[in-house]
Structure formats: structure tokens, C-alpha cells
From Swiss-Prot:
One of its GO terms (molecular function) is zinc ion binding. Its main location: cytoplasm. The lineage of its organism: Bacteria, Bacillati, Bacillota, Bacilli, Lactobacillales. This is Protein SprT-like. Zn(2+) binds at residues 64, 68. Residues 4-140 form the SprT-like domain. It comes from the Bacteria. It comes from Streptococcus pyogenes serotype M3 (strain ATCC BAA-595 / MGAS315). Belongs to the SprT family.
């Protein structure tokens, strides 16, 4: 079954309305489960949400995007802030927020040589340029494990 067929099935089963456009996987999505494009009506979905959280959570993400889709084409409020959107999302039991990833987001660990303050960062920092925020001591990179 293709992604578009799956979205069509969810739309008919949960909303009672057809889905007339295309649905695509988008590997570039990092922090969101999916996106709706009002200009041409297609939906993008993050494949990692299905891999990491399973079909039950992914179906709720599809419901969320279909709420945007159906409300837009009905001419009603389709933004997150709109009451129509919140009501329809609650009615179909969709997710309001995407679950956080189970993977650790901190890759680099630093500690102050003077006071021992520990810092965790996603990106590397220039140890010659930055110092401890507490005591202005020198930072050193800890071994990653």
C-alpha cells in the first residue's frame, strides 16, 4: 500500500471524506510529523515518525494533517490556533504535538576545569573562544560514551 492510499483510507475511515491529492515521504523533516501545503493540497510526512513510534502514533499524525486539509478545503479555520481545528482534532483523536525522539540529542559534552560545571551541546564549540558561564574557567571536552 502506498502512502497516498493509506492517507485516503484514513480520511474515509476517520473523517468520512475523500482525500483527492498526493501524500509524500519527506526525509528532510526533522522536528515535525508532517506538513500540509495549501497551495497544491499535498501532504508531506516524516518517515522517522513511523519507524520510531509505530503505526498507531503515525495514524494520529496523519489525522492531524488531514484536519488541516479538510478544514482548508471547507473554507474553515485550519490553523493550530483556530477553534475549528482544535475541535476537529479532538473529535478524530489526532495528535496535537509530535512525540519527542527517543534518541539522545546531545552529542558533545564539555566541563569546566575550574568549577566542574557540565555543558551538553548538539554542536561543537570553539574551546579557544568560549569559557565557563559561572567562573570564566577553561572548558574541556569530555569523552563521549
Amino acid at each position: 500500500m502506498t502512502l497516498t492510499n493509506y492517507v485516503q483510507e484514513v480520511s474515509l475511515a476517520d473523517f468520512g471524506k475523500p482525500f483527492h491529492h498526493k501524500a509524500y515521504w519527506n526525509k528532510r523533516l526533522k522536528t515535525t510529523g508532517g506538513r500540509f501545503f495549501p497551495k497544491d493540497g499535498h501532504l508531506d510526512f516524516n518517515p522517522r515518525m513511523l519507524e520510531e513510534h509505530g503505526e498507531l502514533i503515525f495514524r494520529k499524525i496523519v489525522r492531524h494533517e488531514l484536519c488541516h486539509y479538510h478544514l482548508y478545503f471547507e473554507g474553515r479555520g485550519y490553523h493550530h490556533k483556530d477553534r475549528d481545528f482544535k475541535d476537529l482534532l479532538a473529535q478524530v483523536n489526532g495528535l496535537r504535538y509530535v512525540p519527542t525522539s527517543s534518541k539522545s540529542k546531545t552529542n558533545h559534552h564539555y566541563s569546566c576545569q575550574t568549577c566542574g560545571q557540565v555543558y551538553q551541546r548538539k554542536r561543537r564549540i570553539n574551546l579557544a573562544k568560549y569559557v565557563c558561564g559561572n567562573c570564566h574557567g577553561k572548558l574541556m571536552e569530555k569523552n563521549q560514551s
